[in-house]
Amino acid sequence: MKPEDFRADAKRPLTGEEYLKSLQDGREIYIYGERVKDVTTHPAFRNAAASIAQMYDALHKPDMQDTLCWGTDTGSGGYTHKFFRVAKSADDLRQQRDAIAEWSRLSYGWMGRTPDYKAAFGCALGANPAFYGQFEQNARNWYTRIQETGLYFNHAIVNPPIDRHKPADEVKDVYIKLEKETDAGIIVSGAKVVATNSALTHYNMIGFGSAQVMGENPDFALMFVAPMDAEGVKLISRASYEMVAGATGSPYDYPLSSRFDENDAILVMDHVLIPWENVLIYRDFDRCRRWTMEGGFARMYPLQACVRLAVKLDFITALLKKSLECTGTHEFRGVQADLGEVVAWRNMFWALSDSMCSEATPWVNGAYLPDHAALQTYRVMAPMAYAKIKNIIERNVTSGLIYLPSSARDLNNPQIDQYLAKYVRGSNGMDHVERIKILKLMWDAIGSEFGGRHELYEINYSGSQDEVRLQCLRQAQSSGNMDKMMAMVDRCMSEYDQHGWTVPHLHNNTDINMLDKLLK
């Protein structure tokens, strides 16, 4: 069965229950040396799956529908999440921004690869299907399916960190390549990284990132959609923070790890048949190379990414304030200044999301794209911001992050709880249970394995740091902004020379220059 076949009503997206059922398809997921029978019930994945299901359920709640949903443009007569339909104006983008934010608040910004992330790919297919040449109709069909059902896509576009100094066609034993062409489709083998949360998705888009060297063998120049239950598709998962949290603690100890862990996995394809209707680019280096700049996804996904980070920083800012109140340092001038800096970082990303929408630019077929300069700024600044904010938290909360008991179980032991009540209480009348709860939440956010992974995630979210900054420079050059800035400097320098001012409205200093008088 296809995911859309689980819907009781074809005019609406999946519900949470239908989403969970659609994952029970025999997909080949491995963790801790064993194959997972059902990701919706396995302790390594079940709470993350339930958290995504909650997002699907929100699409059908009357009090959230106005913010989250609007009608489809496919002729189905149904409705969908706003970011699953192509924006046709700046106001459409603003409404999409608000829908993204509302959905993200369900995970407090801690789930990044939610269904709306790759909805940007679906919209790119729908807005510019002609880019895919002979596979134009495939692009149109996928846009319709993604939009009407709310299909959960991920992508795997980065090659494994093996021999990256070589072109793809010189690492044939590792990177995904064409094995064989058949009447039914293409057969592919190889691996990709990192397939974040793919264990809980319906499909993976396989392609190339912008910073990778492709080589000359067209058997590597592919882009296609792989169902997660396709024979030969395998995910080898990293350790599950959710499962570790459940096995060694409780929600009180690990309130984020235990429900929002988007497991990153090694994606292996072992002679996988990809039907022709799932192929988007086939043995076409030129189109693969142009996809990043012309395909549209790279211009669309940063809106979701920026808004999701802004929501996350709302949460972190408030949690930092609570943590400082625990320790009694929240009124110190220097501490308040650091908290103010975190607020400024938070404000910047909300402002960038505003700019992406208000300065939106027309694209093809009536579609609108987020402002390019704003999204490039987000991509450059986000890694800097996250690392700086984490450092501010560590410098200001200090030992409060680890001056904590091992587990909620300690609170149930009267022999030690009496000491915890006295020596681990909060400031200004806060009891020890509340203080420990707040600071364990902060530790899970930045200090646990889950928290450390999130720092790595935010720093590398948009790919190579050099490439991200180079793209920002290229955008300034291609848009003409660099020429305008250069022209301003040239105009300034043209207004004077070694003899004085060259413009008529300024007065030369020959009448007051002391050196002229002294050296006569």
Annotated model-derived regions:
Residues 3-58:
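N-terminal-proximal low-complexity accessory segments that begin disordered
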Residues 46, 50, 144-147, 311-314, ...:
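Generic structural signal for well-ordered, non-transmembrane alpha-helical segments
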Residues 57-153, 203:
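Internal helix-loop-helix
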Residues 155-308, 475-519:
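FAD-binding core of flavoproteins
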Residues 158, 325, 351-358, 387-394, ...:
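Charged/polar positions within long, soluble alpha-helices
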Residues 304-362:
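Extended amphipathic alpha-helical segments enriched in small hydrophobics
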Residues 336-340, 368-376:
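Short, charged, amphipathic alpha-helical segments
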Residues 373-516:
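Alpha-helix capping/hinge segments and adjacent helical runs
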